Amino acid sequence: MKFFIDTANINEIREANDLGILAGVTTNPSLVAKEGVDFHERLREITSLVKGSVSAEVVALDAEGMIKEGKELAAIAPNITVKVPMTTEGLKAVHAFHQEGITTNVTLVFSAVQALLAARAGATYVSPFLGRLDDIGHDGLDLISQIAEIFHVHDLDIQIIAASIRHPQHVTEAALRGAHIATIPFKVISQLSKHPLTDKGIEQFLKDWNNR
């Protein structure tokens, strides 16, 4: 499974990139608004730093508007992936992008049939939201399993991005259940390498070394 970072903060992206694990970035309108920066300029910064897929989301709700925005975003850099919401208008836009060779990430996916629709429309990635499903008492990880099985059975060439990651266990379980990618907030990325027994082991090694 590959690691993406879910942020529009350039400093967080730099720090994660320095770890040597970062394969891509996902952004959304809320994350960009939080930064208070020009959207296109920030995308230029990110795409110059990260060579993998960088998801940039359209804000139009109609297919025509999505296609117009998406083409403008895709023109910023060759590694831009146009992020499109899972709606009927979004599916129309994804189909149009697919015909033009523009990569897409269908977001806000909460059911397996939505993921199947995205795949058939020609999406490159599909993003089921784990945490938000957990919030309403559903099992987001079960959704990953369902989508992975459907894609396998029907031999669909599309990658699953586990999104709305809340904690390290989400990452582990998503990998076990067939997600190709996890897009992770910087706070959770910072927790992935930590374990109390690792800290305890280092402390003991140093103690033994200093007492030799």
From Swiss-Prot:
GO (cellular component) term, any one: cytoplasm
Catalytic residues, chain numbering: 83
Compartments reported by the entry: Cytoplasm
Swiss-Prot/TrEMBL catalytic activity: D-sedoheptulose 7-phosphate + D-glyceraldehyde 3-phosphate = D-erythrose 4-phosphate + beta-D-fructose 6-phosphate
GO molecular function, one term: aldehyde-lyase activity
NCBIfam families: fsa_talC_mipB
Function summary: Transaldolase is important for the balance of metabolites in the pentose-phosphate pathway.
Protein's UniProt name: Probable transaldolase
Originating species: Halalkalibacterium halodurans (strain ATCC BAA-125 / DSM 18197 / FERM 7344 / JCM 9153 / C-125)
Gene: tal
